């Protein structure tokens, strides 16, 4: 066979180089030497790799030990090929290299050298673990298990005869020099790999009881045969979880520079594990390490159903990846998806706690949740604090968001309760003005321990779109609805402990703390049987009393905005625009109930006195007769306009008339009292509707009129003689008119002071007196 191969090489060389005269003896000699060099490359690679894994480092290199050069000093022979002296290891049987010494280069199979960790000597109480870069131990295998070996690295040495250079130049010296560099590189790289560090550590700690059971073995395998992974942990299987690795993979590969010849190419490569820090631990030590890791790892809190932000999606625990028993005790994902605590509260309902039979620490979860709720509502009003105390399990929304909070209904609800649950997806809100028209089902948000609901109040003015919503107490008031709150329902955790219930009842016993939405439900057309509180009217009146200071500020802003809008009109329409501002403010008062005191309008003249002064200057320059204030015999007040067809509001004092008398304190006091009294029309026939101009500062300003208009009332106490006097009043010059106006105002101030002292009565007395006057006049 060798002669046939040489003749084949000779023919190929003749084809490539027809002009060359090559003797058969020279070609045969070159090919035989090249075959011997390639075979020595396989043998030298095996000796370097196995020696770096089994022989102590002091005897590994003959350069460090000159005594190894003497054959008589050692019983083993020294292999001096490629200028690298290595002892022939007795541990390496000659039969293992038989395939790569007897066969020809074309039939030489690839050689695979595996280095593995032998686990057969472990006792029943020991477990092998692998430490990662952070020092965390990860269980590999237990003693007596199915896995007996852990593959650390795999070398591949092959001669590819298909990749030939085809050169006939004297290549042996060049190939030999390249082989010297290659094996010196392999010698150095083999001592820098993780497997060599493990072998060195095992030799140093050979007397240790924890490491004397571990040994490193080597195998030489035929590369043409399939490699079985039965009974061992293969190189492709990771021990440390991928998410805990600092590198892209748990293994690495290295390809050395190949050597090309005329017969083929020699290639050497390696694949190895990046982590080889193996140790032996006792089973008790592994369990204690596992429990310590569980304590240090953030777990899911079952009390209020939220997890830490650094929890991964899968359970990753050291010393538990290789043991089913340990994996059962490791922290895993709960059956229900946890909800994370949001940095900005948006009014979400906290998740339900565990059932009563599994809540030994439910008090801790509830107290933590209450602390979160109190912290989020620290900057709110007292009313929101009352809402938090009544429902400590529900978290109210922040004042910086207007997002909706959907609440999924329970699957066990009936049709009636399902409808109520669907209505809960809307944002809950109670307007700070006279009542909101938002149609929501409040039965689901009533508190069974109290007689009223506890809302949070927003500002009394601002546009409708900028209203801030808040969640009210989410509780069931009926037994049928309460049965729907099962353990799996999102609302099942909204309950109050016994001690908290007693405290809430003591708070609810005070009538000053009770609020209701019955007035809102009445305006929105909802039936009263859906409300959870019986005393809705009284609670609404108390709510309106608390809102008086907000209403006063809203009226002031409303008047200023309307005045700015009407000041652009001509001088004749200036006074009428100011009168319209009073109509708007009085129409707002009329929406209050009779029992609640209306806010005083005395602050109206302190806010915008400059606007009134400008209105006076414009009206004085225009044509027309100023409005007159007269006191009829019945004790009421009537404002006479220049034209009988222009209706004005009863008891209206225009700012144009009062601007000249700010220094008169008695006049301001009387005007404040008159403006605080409610204005009511005597009959519906005398009421006329006019469109309202200007910007509305409260959504409840036009609740009573769906077309967005305020009601102006005609003066029913006007005397025909006074009307004729006003109509027949001669027109005078500008200077004469100013003097007449000044005299008229002085007389009017005196009459108002007298009437204010004599007619200081309640709201109910005023209505009764005006009704009597109306009956007297009509009769």
Curated annotation (Swiss-Prot):
GO annotations under biological process? mitophagy; piecemeal microautophagy of the nucleus; protein localization to phagophore assembly site; protein transport
Q: Where is the composition biased (Polar residues)?
A: 308-320, 426-455, 471-488, 520-533, 642-652
Primary localization class, coarse: cytoplasm
Signal peptide segment: none
Residue segments, region Disordered: 298-368, 392-488, 520-541, 571-652
Which InterPro entries has this protein been placed in?
ATG13, Atg13_N, HORMA_dom_sf
Q: Where is the composition biased (Low complexity)?
A: 394-425, 456-470, 593-602, 620-632
What family is this protein classified in? Belongs to the ATG13 family. Fungi subfamily.
- What's the stated role of this polypeptide? Activates the ATG1 kinase in a nutritional condition dependent manner through the TOR pathway, leading to autophagy. Also involved in cytoplasm to vacuole transport (Cvt) and more specifically in Cvt vesicle formation. Seems to play a role in the switching machinery regulating the conversion between the Cvt pathway and autophagy. Finally, ATG13 is also required for glycogen storage during stationary phase.
**Name by which UniProt lists this protein:** Autophagy-related protein 13
Give the source species. Scheffersomyces stipitis (strain ATCC 58785 / CBS 6054 / NBRC 10063 / NRRL Y-11545) (Yeast)
Q: What is the lineage of its organism?
A: Eukaryota, Fungi, Dikarya, Ascomycota, Saccharomycotina
Gene designation per UniProt: ATG13
């Amino acid at each position: 066979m060798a002669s046939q191969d040489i003749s084949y090489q000779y023919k190929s060389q003749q084809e490539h180089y027809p002009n060359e005269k090559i003797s058969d003896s020279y070609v045969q000699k070159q090919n035989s030497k090249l075959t011997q060099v390639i075979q020595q490359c396989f043998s030298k690679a095996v000796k370097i790799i196995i020696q770096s894994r089994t022989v102590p480092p002091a005897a590994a290199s003959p350069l460090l030990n000159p005594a190894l050069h003497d054959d008589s000093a050692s019983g083993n022979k020294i292999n001096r090929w490629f200028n690298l002296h290595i002892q022939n290891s007795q541990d390496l049987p000659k039969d293992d290299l038989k395939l790569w010494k007897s066969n020809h280069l074309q039939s030489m199979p690839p050689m695979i050298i595996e280095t593995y960790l032998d686990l057969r000597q472990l006792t029943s109480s020991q477990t092998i673990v692998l430490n990662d870069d952070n020092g965390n131990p990860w269980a590999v295998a237990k003693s007596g298990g199915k896995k007996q070996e852990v593959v650390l690295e795999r070398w591949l040495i092959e001669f590819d005869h298909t990749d030939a250079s085809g050169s006939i130049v004297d290549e042996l010296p060049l190939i030999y020099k390249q082989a010297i560099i290659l094996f010196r590189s392999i010698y150095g790289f083999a001592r820098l790999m993780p497997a060599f560090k493990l072998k060195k550590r095992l030799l140093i700690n050979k007397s240790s009881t924890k490491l004397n059971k571990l040994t490193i073995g080597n195998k030489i395998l035929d590369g043409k045969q399939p490699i079985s992974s039965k009974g061992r942990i293969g190189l492709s299987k990771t021990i440390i979880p991928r998410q805990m690795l600092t590198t892209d993979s748990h293994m690495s590969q290295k390809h050395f520079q190949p050597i090309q010849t005329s017969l083929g190419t020699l290639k050497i490569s390696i694949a190895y594990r990046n982590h080889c820090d193996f140790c032996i631990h006792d089973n008790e030590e592994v369990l204690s390490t596992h429990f310590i890791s569980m304590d240090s790892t953030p777990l899911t809190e079952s009390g209020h159903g939220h997890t830490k932000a650094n929890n991964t999606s899968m359970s990753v625990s050291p010393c538990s990846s290789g043991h089913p028993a340990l994996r059962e005790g490791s922290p895993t994902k709960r059956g229900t998806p946890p909800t994370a605590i949001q940095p900005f509260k948006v009014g979400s309902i906290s998740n339900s706690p565990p059932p009563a039979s599994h809540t030994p620490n439910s008090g801790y979860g509830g107290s933590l949740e209450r602390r979160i709720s109190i912290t989020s509502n620290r900057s709110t009003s007292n009313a929101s604090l009352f809402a938090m105390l009544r429902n400590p399990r529900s978290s109210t929304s922040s004042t910086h968001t207007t997002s909706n909070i959907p609440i999924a209904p329970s699957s066990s609800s009936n049709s009636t309760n399902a409808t109520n649950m669907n209505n809960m997806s809307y944002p809950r809100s109670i307007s700070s003005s006279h009542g909101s028209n938002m149609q929501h089902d409040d039965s689901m948000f009533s508190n069974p321990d109290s007689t009223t609901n506890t809302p949070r109040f927003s500002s009394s003015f601002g546009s409708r779109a900028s209203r801030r919503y808040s969640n009210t107490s989410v509780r069931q008031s009926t037994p049928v609805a309460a049965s729907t709150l099962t353990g799996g329902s999102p609302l099942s955790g909204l309950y109050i402990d016994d001690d908290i219930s007693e405290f809430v009842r003591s708070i609810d016993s005070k009538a000053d703390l009770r609020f209701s939405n019955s007035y809102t439900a009445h305006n929105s057309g909802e039936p009263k049987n859906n409300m959870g509180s019986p005393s809705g009217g009284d609670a609404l009146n108390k709510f309106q009393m608390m809102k008086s200071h907000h209403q006063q500020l809203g009226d002031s802003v409303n008047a200023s905005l309307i005045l700015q809008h009407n000041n652009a009109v001509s001088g004749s329409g200036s006074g009428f625009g100011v009168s319209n501002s009073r109509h708007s403010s009085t129409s707002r008062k009329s929406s209050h109930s009779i029992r609640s005191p209306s806010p005083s309008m005395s602050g109206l003249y302190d806010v915008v006195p400059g606007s009134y002064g400008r209105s006076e200057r414009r009206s004085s320059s225009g044509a027309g007769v100023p409005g007159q204030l007269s006191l009829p015999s019945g004790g009421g007040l009537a404002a006479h306009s220049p034209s009988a067809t222009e209706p004005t509001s009863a008891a209206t004092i225009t700012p144009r008339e009062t601007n000249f008398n700010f220094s008169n304190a008695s006049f301001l006091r009387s005007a404040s009292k008159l403006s605080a009294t409610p204005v009511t029309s005597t009959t519906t026939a005398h009421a006329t509707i006019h469109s309202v101009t200007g910007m509305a500062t409260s959504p409840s300003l036009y609740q009573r009129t769906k077309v967005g208009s305020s009601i102006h009332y005609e003066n029913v106490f006007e005397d025909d003689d006074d009307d004729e006097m006003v109509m027949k009043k001669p027109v005078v010059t500008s200077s004469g008119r100013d003097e007449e106006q000044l005299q008229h105002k002085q007389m009017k101030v005196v009459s108002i002071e007298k009437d204010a002292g004599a007619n200081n009565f309640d709201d109910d007395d005023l209505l009764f007196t005006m009704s009597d006057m109306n009956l007297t006049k009509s009769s």
